[in-house]
Amino acid sequence: MAGGAGEQRGEPSSPDPSSVPTLPCLYHVDIGHSRRAPVRNDFKYRSYMWLFDVDEPPVVSKLWRPLARYRPDDHLDVRRLMADQGIEVSKLLVLTNLAVAGYVFNPISIYWGYREDGTLAARAAEVHNTYGSRHCYVLNADDPAKKVAEANKQMYVSPFYPLDGRYRISISDPGSSLAVSVTLERPEDPPFRAWMTGEHVANNSGALLRLAIRYPAAPLRGRVLIQWQGLRLWARGVPLKKEAKLIAGIAQPRCDPGSITSSEEKDMSK
């Protein structure tokens, strides 16, 4: 995720109402990052994301299709990854970006897996970096009602941090609003925090058009903003980690079977 507010926010709480809105739907989101060392840097931007059942993705008219296209290959098979951990789900919801004009970038996609009786079975966070790697964290499978989870970092995300560290991830339930918080904790550094809050927007052509006009090429815009912040940090003297110079294909992720289900690394040196 990208962007960070100056103020510190608490862990996400359950939205009101707790019931999932009619799907598919849109969320108007604020996304932010907050860094405290070696320099202080906060930034925030606004965008929009989709919430839908992966078995029933949004289908828009041919006229508006360039504004929203779901491509399964843009994501890991999270249902299968949950099944690999013994978690069977009959419904899988995802909060994510859809391709706009053929391009998509998802720093983070959030999943909620439900059993046949409608109870929550697991949450998951699928993380993508700007180098083409992606990794899926299945969270609190033993206690899905718990909204806060911890997991060892398994993939390079920022070239300013090494591979080690531990995430604290908090995910609310989707409703009229939602909230996600990811905090990277390392013994030698102050916590780095990324967060996202969203407000439900009904899914109709008018709402999609208004958001697409307000945030043109939203996935590309998000990536550019993330990389722009990276350039600013580098210009302010924040050093790149030695390992990060081999980014994403040479350094292999470690395995934490308690929280990590899958990763994909692409060799960008080729």
List each model region and its residues.
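Mature, function-bearing regions of proteins
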Residues: A2-K270
